[in-house]
């Protein structure tokens, strides 16, 4: 993977966190996240395919694994979002590494139990979260 210059990574890190926060606000108002992303991409034609892929993957991963990452509310949003992203995409993005570097190794877990163990290690949870926590 090509690694962009540090100033580009910093800009992407700031942008991705802002997009995620806007998506959270959108969902808290009772609106679907896919409509938010659609509106975002229409407003910002300058976002290329890589930007759109990063934003979409991060936002959907965040909401997919929210039941687990919310078990560590003291952690910053960036750390919880990066952990959720890494559950789906073990090869992280440089912008996410800048926002929330992980001490533990990232490996693709094949089972839900394996993913729960990874989340526990990344977020500092005493035990792996139960699968039932994923269902609202």
Which sequence ranges carry the predicted segments?
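Class I Rossmann-like S-adenosyl-L-methionine
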Residues: 1-136
């Amino acid at each position: 993977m090509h690694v962009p210059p540090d100033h580009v990574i910093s800009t992407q890190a700031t942008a991705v966190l802002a997009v995620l926060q806007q998506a959270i606000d959108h969902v808290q108002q009772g609106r679907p996240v896919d409509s938010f992303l659609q509106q975002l991409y229409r407003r910002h034609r300058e976002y290329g395919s890589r930007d759109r892929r990063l934003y979409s993957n991060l936002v959907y991963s965040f909401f997919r694994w929210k039941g687990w990452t919310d078990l560590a509310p003291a952690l910053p949003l960036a750390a919880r979002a990066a952990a959720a992203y890494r559950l789906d995409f073990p090869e992280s993005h440089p912008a996410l590494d800048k926002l929330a570097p992980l001490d533990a190794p990232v490996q693709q877990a094949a089972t839900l139990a394996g993913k729960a163990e990874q989340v526990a290690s990344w977020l500092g949870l005493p035990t792996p979260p139960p699968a039932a926590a994923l269902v609202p």
